[in-house]
Structures are given as C-alpha cells and as structure tokens.
C-alpha cells in the first residue's frame, strides 16, 4: 500500500449500524471521532436510504454536519448553518419554518423507461 495517499477530505457515514448503534444512538467514541475529523477539516456527511425528513435529530444535531446524502444517494442536501431546522423546515408548516429551505445539490431521477421496466418486473411477482 502506498504511503503517499492523499489526505481524507470527506467521510460519508451510513446511519444504521455505522453512525447509529443498535439503539439508534451515536456513541461517545463516535462523537469524538467525528469532532476530531471536522476539527481537521474533514467534511462528515451522513448517508442514508431514508428521505431527508427521516434524518434522525441526533444526526442533524451533530456539530459540523452541513450536508446529507439521502434517498439511497439520489439527493445531496446543503443543510446550511441550522441542519436540524433545515430538515424540519422542508416538511413543516410553512408558517412555522425555522430556517430557509435546504438546497438540493444533486438529485438523480430514474429515466422513465427504466422505471417502466422495473415496474413491469415488479408486476410479475404480484
């Protein structure tokens, strides 16, 4: 293995079983590792198959969390300076918004023909 590896600039962490333990909590050791990483300029990004609205508050409240990868990688969000507020403002009552809409930096849609093929395959097993 080469000793001249480039420095780590971004770490994407899956939620269940990686960032969150079996109780849905972030352990003190994991919190400490994330704090050290962000202090060293590493961007730490939670990554999940869940939609943005299902990002657990314990994750959104982690210091240094600014971005989130959701929907199995189909969307990448800039949560701004108030990640928890951004997560909830996206789906909350407009009159109660605590922050501006998060910016969706990337959204990949499945081509219509691929969706039709997948649906046809699914119907074979109905």
Language-model segments: residues:
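Mg2+-dependent phosphoryl-transfer enzymes with acidic/Ser/Thr/Gly-rich catalytic loops
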Residues: 2-10, 26-28
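Asp-based phosphoryl-transfer active-site loop
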Residues: 9-23
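Short, solvent-exposed loop/turn segments at secondary-structure boundaries
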Residues: 23-26, 106
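Active-site phosphate-binding/coordination module
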Residues: 30-126
């Amino acid at each position: 293995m080469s000793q001249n590896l480039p420095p780590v600039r971004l770490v994407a962490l899956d939620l269940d079983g990686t960032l969150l333990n079996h109780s849905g909590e972030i352990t003190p050791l994991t919190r400490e590792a994330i704090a050290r990483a962000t202090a060293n300029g590493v961007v730490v990004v939670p990554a999940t198959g869940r939609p943005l609205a299902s990002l657990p508050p314990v994750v959104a409240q982690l210091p240094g969390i600014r971005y989130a990868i959701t929907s199995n990688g189909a969307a990448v969000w800039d949560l701004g300076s108030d990640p928890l507020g951004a997560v909830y403002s996206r789906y909350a009552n407009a009159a109660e918004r605590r922050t501006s809409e998060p910016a969706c930096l990337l959204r990949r849609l499945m081509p219509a023909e691929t969706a039709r093929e997948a649906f046809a395959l699914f119907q074979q097993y109905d």
